[in-house]
């Protein structure tokens, strides 16, 4: 990824031009999309054109707001002060919530929640939290961020790969707020950044980490299990083979977060209902999804967490098995083995 001084003038300018063009041409684009959907008898073109108009309208609004905040912060000099941090969190909350509402409406997704009272109390109370979630399906990240921002009024610090910074709104907000934007080619730097962000969580801060490192697919699961075997981690490979709906977690990122904030409670989250529609092609083919996104959360108290790193890996796998069992009990997703007749592998982030 090019440095910000090179990247942002290009991406911000391009996004501004595209956003303005999409909004100006939106009546024509929507009319053409409606015609195409009527001719083909398939709604995808109209649905995604509507979604694109919403997306670029929000992108334009956020870029203008980011520019205004930069000027108000004396050219960025006051950007790290509490006032401007709160203003950026409010901007992020508004952007994510509006997009989420339109996204779930257009794709016909219904939301259902299961959660323990302990997890709810921890999220509602003050105190830093670590939030480890399964990663599968389109947009689960934004759904979780919206929940943390809007329902629980938390300030999420998200761990994600730097490739998403190609979106200038994500790029600007992610670097103005304490998110962990990672170059995954440098494992030590990734762990250090996760540890740093976890250590700096405030009273309403929550670190959102996907220990699997990528969306679940049967092929990714096979590859991950093969990689565990090749690296001599046979016990973890054997445990991963007994989990059909999740990728084996990569412990390094989770352990870095625990090192950074050893006193923080951990909330584990799983969700079901979106199946394997994790990539653009699958989403296009299955739209409208007309599904129920069911999520569940559990609190893992500090007192029940081992201090030894090796024991923490076992603890993490124990929880991941619990998430897998919950997904299996929902009955809405086909086990990985059924896709290819095998019980093997899939990858992740640090």
Regions found by a protein language model. Name each.
Residues 154-156, 162-177, 202-310:
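A cross-family acyltransferase "interaction/gating" segment
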Residues 130-132, 267, 320:
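Conserved beta-strand elements of the Class I
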Residues 46, 185-214:
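Internal hydrophobic scaffold segments of catalytic domains
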Residues 4, 118-120, 137, 146, ...:
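Polar-ligand-bearing catalytic/cofactor-coordination segments
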Residues 306-350:
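Accessory terminal regions of nucleic-acid processing enzymes
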Residues 1-129, 143:
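Membrane-anchoring hydrophobic helices of lipid-metabolizing enzymes
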Residues 12, 139-140, 188-193, 248-252:
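Short, glycine/acidic-rich beta->alpha junctions
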